[in-house]
Amino acid sequence: MSELFWFEKYRPRSFEEVVDLEEVKARLREFVKAGNLPHLLFYGPPGTGKTTMALVLARELYGEYWRENTLELNASDERGIGVIRERVKEFARTAPVGKAPFKLVILDEADNMTSDAQQALRRIMEIYAQNTRFILLANYVSRIIDPIISRCAVFRFSPMPRHLMAERLREIARSEGVELKDDAIDLIYEISEGDMRKAINLLQVAAAVSKVVDANAVASAAAAVRPSDVLELFNLAMGGDLAKARDKLRELMYIKGVAGVDLIRVFQRELIRMQLDDDVKAEVAELLSEVDYRLTQGADEEIQLMYFLMKLGSIGKKIRVAPKKR
């Protein structure tokens, strides 16, 4: 197996290789065709293709000289706006290589910068606008100040649809000589929530153990809980069998290594699909929110989850003894 991270190994190198994001690709192609582009702001959840698209754009603009004409920075890694200013100044002082009229600065995690730092960034963008274009990458556009947004063409990136993720994972598995089961794809999608980088990394970790990757291999690789385990835990508690529910909880937490907060997340996701009356769902959802909050405040995971299971037992008992509707 190659030591290279599969996410990097299979990163698209051209617009044609990028799956999904058709509207984004169409607009960026127009910029490339015109030989010019404004400052850009790409925003959306992690793993939705922001960095990949920025690098593809650089390749399309500069061809073989894309590395010489592109500067990648991470706002979280740099030691303040002063360092970013100096690096951009040093980069922008030399002429672009080739025929391009400008160089490209890709700034990741721009939304992690303070408002003051973003104001300074805005001034940097203005100073070097003659021969430098910026692509800002952010998870949350709401954390970017308006003066920067108004100077950029803004593009929204969404999580990859399940069918496209499945298709891509199968392609990678075939290339690596891995047999990928359908239940593995289902679980990878559930865990990754459309984050393609996370999905490919999960596949690689699972494939490192076995060339046949099923849901069990994925769950083990991710230290993740399967929806079926959560449903079993839920049914045991709702049925009043708290002893077995406790044993199942401890198995998940201490043998399979599942974090309590991850259990709550899967409970929240699966609750929507459960065949329960709306008032029961609302009561369970409120209970999940209460436990989730306590966990974020540092409360003991096992105690809080046992409290949750006991409350489920009480809810189940009320349902069982409630008079039948005529």
UniProtKB/Swiss-Prot annotation:
Gene Ontology biological-process annotations: DNA repair; DNA-templated DNA replication
Protein name: Replication factor C small subunit
Gene3D superfamilies reported in the protein's UniProt record: 1.10.8.60, 1.20.272.10, P-loop containing nucleotide triphosphate hydrolases
Lineage: superkingdom: Archaea
GO cellular component: DNA replication factor C complex
Function: Part of the RFC clamp loader complex which loads the PCNA sliding clamp onto DNA.
HAMAP family: RfcS
Residue sites binding ATP per the record: 44-51
PANTHER family attached to this UniProt entry: REPLICATION FACTOR C / DNA POLYMERASE III GAMMA-TAU SUBUNIT, REPLICATION FACTOR C SUBUNIT 4
Assembly mode: Heteromultimer composed of small subunits (RfcS) and large subunits (RfcL).
Native source species: Pyrobaculum calidifontis (strain DSM 21063 / JCM 11548 / VA1)
InterPro entries with a match to the protein in the record: AAA+_ATPase, ATPase_AAA_core, DNA_pol3_clamp-load_cplx_C, DNA_Rep/Repair_Clamp_Loader, P-loop_NTPase, Rep_factor-C_ssu_arc, Rep_factorC_C, RFC_lid
SMART domains, per database record: AAA (SM00382)
A single MF term (Gene Ontology): ATP binding
Similarity section: Belongs to the activator 1 small subunits family. RfcS subfamily.
Keyword terms: ATP-binding, DNA replication, Nucleotide-binding
Coiled-coil ranges per UniProt: none
This protein's record includes keyword ATP-binding: yes
